[in-house]
């Protein structure tokens, strides 16, 4: 029996986001196949580690204690779930006297994430809303030298990726379309270490076509309310067009919370939207069961678990063509709809057509119920088992 240690940031609360939901699914399914899975996590300041899923002193480890902990637990495989965002774990492991385990780094988003999200508008928003003088000055300087600053950010991302890539036995990407992007940042061929494993379905079951009989005139968004990545302001502007075109019987439900929640509330009021409901942090499954359509407006995603969640619950997903893995999930017009990035008019027109045409809506939903089975947990875990056993 092999012991696998998953390492990520934050406790394993599945409502936190995609990485946590996927980690929980994989751990549960690998344990069913005879593996022993343990979880190690660090807080946002990366100052220490916690064992299990408990953030208290009894479970706290200093970085210097991690090597002994992994040895004591007889860990065979360490899976770093934060390879896109931190080199802390990699540098720690690289300093071990004797490494007795396989090290796998997972890139849970496209390597282009920093280039796509560190925008001038983000700096301007931070400048307006941060209260500290030093923070305002820092953002002001960055805006003044924005092209140079962004080039530095992108270069720094490449260095971070290189540290994690070089120290890993294998690197897991969610889409083969991301391989050349990682290669661009590393300035080398990455085929030697990279392997593609898609994310699994995260709900326990795929609904039957009978679920389509119970759908309401609801449109759904499930997302962190982080506007720089998720671009929910665009969703509200699209919804404004839809309301203005007379679709007053349809309602938009936004499930999630985040830093820009107040800003989005204010924008909805400014646009005088009538049928928009901010639901906060809630279990999302009941909302999927009621919804007919799902909106994604993100600037960037790694996989987009909410798309496969919508497909397995009979909801038609609609997304901007803004990230590589989207085409691994959706075939436009067959099991979802892909809209040219930033074309708000085309997005609104697509939704309105589906609102008008129940037959077309249900055709796409039925196809989604079938095609999402490509990502059933058994099929995805089999790929993980093959990777682990062949290293």
Task: Give the predicted meaning of each segment.
Residues 20-25, 217, 226-241, 259-265, ...:
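A conserved mid-protein helix/loop that constitutes part of the nucleotide-sugar donor-binding site
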Residues 321, 331-333, 337-344, 353-358, ...:
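Conserved acidic donor-binding segment of nucleotide-sugar-dependent glycosyltransferases
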Residues 346, 353, 360-374, 382-386:
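A short, well-ordered alpha-helix in the C-terminal region of glycosyltransferases
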Residues 80-86, 107:
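Short His-centered aromatic/hydrophobic patch
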Residues 143, 147-193:
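A short, active-site helix/loop in glycosyltransferases that binds the activated sugar's phosphate group
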């Amino acid at each position: 029996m092999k012991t696998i240690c998953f390492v990520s940031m934050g406790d394993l609360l599945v409502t936190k986001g995609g990485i946590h939901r996927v980690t929980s699914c994989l751990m549960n399914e690998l344990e069913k196949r005879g593996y022993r899975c343990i979880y190690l996590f660090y807080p946002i300041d990366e100052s220490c580690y916690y064992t299990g899923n408990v953030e208290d002193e009894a479970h706290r480890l200093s970085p210097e204690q991690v090597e002994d902990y992994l040895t004591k637990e007889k860990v065979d495989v360490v899976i770093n779930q934060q390879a896109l965002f931190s080199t802390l774990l990699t540098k720690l492991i690289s300093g071990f006297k004797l490494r007795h385990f396989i090290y796998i780094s997972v890139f849970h988003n496209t390597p282009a994430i920093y280039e796509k999200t560190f925008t001038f508008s983000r700096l301007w928003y931070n400048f307006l809303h941060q209260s500290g003088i030093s923070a305002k000055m820092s953002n002001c300087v960055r805006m003044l030298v924005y092209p140079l600053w962004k080039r530095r950010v992108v270069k720094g991302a490449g260095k971070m990726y290189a540290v994690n890539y070089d120290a890993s036995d294998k690197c897991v990407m969610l889409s083969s379309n991301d391989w050349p992007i990682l290669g661009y940042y590393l300035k080398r061929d990455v085929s030697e270490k990279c392997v593609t494993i898609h994310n699994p379905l995260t709900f326990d079951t795929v609904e039957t076509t009978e679920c389509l009989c119970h759908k309401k005139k609801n449109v759904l968004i499930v997302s962190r309310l982080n506007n720089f990545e998720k671009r929910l302001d665009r969703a509200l502007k699209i919804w404004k067009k839809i309301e203005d075109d007379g679709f007053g019987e349809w309602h938009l439900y936004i499930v999630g919370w985040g830093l820009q929640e107040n800003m989005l509330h204010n924008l909805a009021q400014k646009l005088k939207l009538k049928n928009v409901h901010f639901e906060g942090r809630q279990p999302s499954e009941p909302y999927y069961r009621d919804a007919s359509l799902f909106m994604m407006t993100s600037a960037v995603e790694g996989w987009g678990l909410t798309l496969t969640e919508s497909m397995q619950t009979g909801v038609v997903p609609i997304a901007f063509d803004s990230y590589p893995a989207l085409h691994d999930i959706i075939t436009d017009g067959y099991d979802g709809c892909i809209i040219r990035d930033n074309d708000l008019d085309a997005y609104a027109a697509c939704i309105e057509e589906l609102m008008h045409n129940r037959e077309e809506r249900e055709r796409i939903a039925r196809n989604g119920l079938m095609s999402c089975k490509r990502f059933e947990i058994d099929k995805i875990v089999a790929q993980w088992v093959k990777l682990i056993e062949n290293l």
